Curated annotation (Swiss-Prot):
InterPro entries (UniProt xref): AllG-like, OXTCase_su_AllG_h-dom
Protein species of origin: Escherichia coli (strain K12)
Gene3D superfamilies associated with the record: conserved protein of unknown function from Enterococcus faecalis V583 (1.10.10.660), Enterococcus faecalis V583 domain (3.90.1710.10), NAD(P)-binding Rossmann-like Domain (3.40.50.720), v583 domain like (3.90.1700.10)
Name of the featured protein: Uncharacterized protein YahG
Gene behind the chain: yahG
S-S bridge residues: none
Length: 472
């Protein structure tokens, strides 16, 4: 038997350490490398914690809590109800408050892109006359820095949000909670990517003085826009609604247009708004973020639940929040995003993973729904087959599917919903996120896009924190 085995061509499946497959390849043996990691990534403390959770007397309560979290995500019905300045609507906003993406961070520890966005926002708000003065003010202790997520908000990339910026107002019709996010500056050299020169400030001024009031008054006429229905339509039209938004932006401006033309503004001002929207498909990107935030907040704070309700990054740390552990962040080091760079830039120019936009993946779209948007690989890299596989694979770490938001290419499977920290811990499969890449230095902006995963440390800490909280 052994003689016949080794006298014929071999096709070896290698599980685990890649060095074995590398050695076989050098000997011209066909090898399939199976990407596998042991439960808890081999950390026996985490393995024991996972076993304790699975065998806990609380098992029935955990299952019921997780089912409730999944149902709240699925049953959430977010609608856009208006636009207004942050100072008027965002809980806790003051003239000297700056909200930012990701878990809490101090000025001293912020990455270049976030510092660039903060100084630009302080100049925009008239709190500093130039960027140097803004940096001094930011370091003085006079400015309150706080995560967007702790103010019912989300913020794209650096996520910097200040008092006079106009915000989406999204209401969860099912549960009544409201979520906010600022408006898209469109793409490349923009504040949220760390750019802060006069052209950036001028654009922010126009958004505050022209676009914001027009959209605010348009929504007073329209009343509400059904975002869950629009999201489902956009996915069926080839978006994944994180980094590809061609369909979503078309649908959103289509819904806003009747209100815009009835709101009483000049034809010239209306033209400026329409041209601005047409300049990039990203106009609806923040809209989906606020929609997802409204749904995920409804699932937060359910006792015993192991469902992830927040994934967010500040360019230094990646942070998770878990439904059954309200008020806590579980952090690990932000990772490098892997993907195509714009001409003239190289990977070492890039900052680390940043932004609250991973709320889209937390809900089940973006990287989780890449099978709806095969064309996204032109932006973030990889192959169409890999994009489709990501959507299948994410089902292994989630509790169910959302029948309201489906993937045609996978037989209209609902998007994978409700990431479970225990499933991530047991399988070693990490959530997939597609995202933009900001330059590591302030003042530059977007330089690429790609794929990234959270560090396992976030899930490790969350699993151990859950066990500590519930005495398991």
């Amino acid at each position: 038997m052994s003689q016949s085995l080794f006298s014929q061509p071999l096709n070896v499946i290698n599980v685990g350490i890649a060095m074995f497959s590398d050695d076989l390849k050098k000997q011209h043996v066909e090898v399939t490398q199976l990407d596998w990691t042991p439960p808890g990534q081999g950390n026996m403390q985490v393995v024991q914690a996972l076993d304790n959770i699975a065998d806990s007397p609380l098992a029935d309560k955990i299952a019921a809590a997780n089912q409730q979290a999944l149902e709240r995500i699925i049953q959430s019905h977010p609608v856009l109800i208006g636009f207004d300045q942050a100072i008027n609507v965002v809980p806790g906003m003051t003239a000297k408050t700056i909200l930012h993406a990701g878990p809490p961070i101090t000025w001293e520890k912020m990455c270049g892109a976030m510092k660039g966005a903060v100084t630009g926002a302080l100049v925009f708000e008239g709190l500093a006359k130039d960027l140097d003065e803004a940096a001094e003010l930011a370091a003085s202790g006079e400015i309150t820095f706080s995560p967007c997520h702790e103010h019912d908000c989300v913020g794209s990339m650096a996520g910097v949000t200040s008092a006079s910026m106009f915000m989406h107002i999204v209401k969860n019709k099912t549960y009544g909670n409201i979520a906010y996010t600022n408006m898209s500056e469109q793409m490349a050299k923009i504040l949220r990517m760390g750019a802060n020169d006069q052209s950036v400030i001028d654009r922010l001024n126009w958004m505050r003085d022209v676009q914001g009031p027009i959209l605010r008054d348009a929504m007073k006429i329209i009343g509400e826009i059904d975002l869950r229905l629009m999201l489902a339509q956009a996915l069926h039209m080839g978006d994944e609604c994180h980094n590809r938004n061609n369909a979503g932006t078309t649908l959103l401006i289509q819904a806003l247009t009747p209100g815009i033309i009835q709101a009483g503004y000049s034809v010239e001002q209306q033209r400026e708004v329409f041209e601005f929207v047409a300049s990039s498909d990203y106009f609806s990107g923040p809209t989906w973020m606020a929609m997802c935030k409204a749904a995920m907040d409804a699932a937060h704070g359910i006792e015993y639940s192991t469902v992830v309700t927040t994934m967010a990054r500040n360019g230094v740390e990646f942070g998770l929040r878990v439904s059954g552990l309200p008020g806590q962040w579980f952090t690990g080091p932000a990772q490098q995003v892997i993907g195509p760079m714009f001409a003239g830039y190289k990977p070492e120019d890039s900052g680390l993973d940043i932004g609250d936009s991973a709320i889209t993946e937390t809900y089940g779209i973006g990287g989780f729904a890449m099978a709806t948007a095969p064309a996204i690989v032109a932006l973030v890299g990889g192959t169409v087959e890999e994009a489709i596989d990501f959507s299948r694979q994410m089902r292994e770490i989630t509790l169910g599917e959302n029948p309201n938001v489906t993937i045609p290419l996978l037989g209209f499977m609902g998007v994978p919903s409700a990431i479970d920290i225990t499933r991530v811990g047991s399988s070693g499969i990490l959530p997939v996120i597609n995202t933009a890449i900001a330059h590591k230095d302030a003042g530059v902006g977007m330089i690429g896009a790609g794929i990234v995963h959270p560090p396992f440390a976030c899930f490790e800490k969350a699993i151990l924190g859950w066990c500590e909280r519930y005495g398991v």
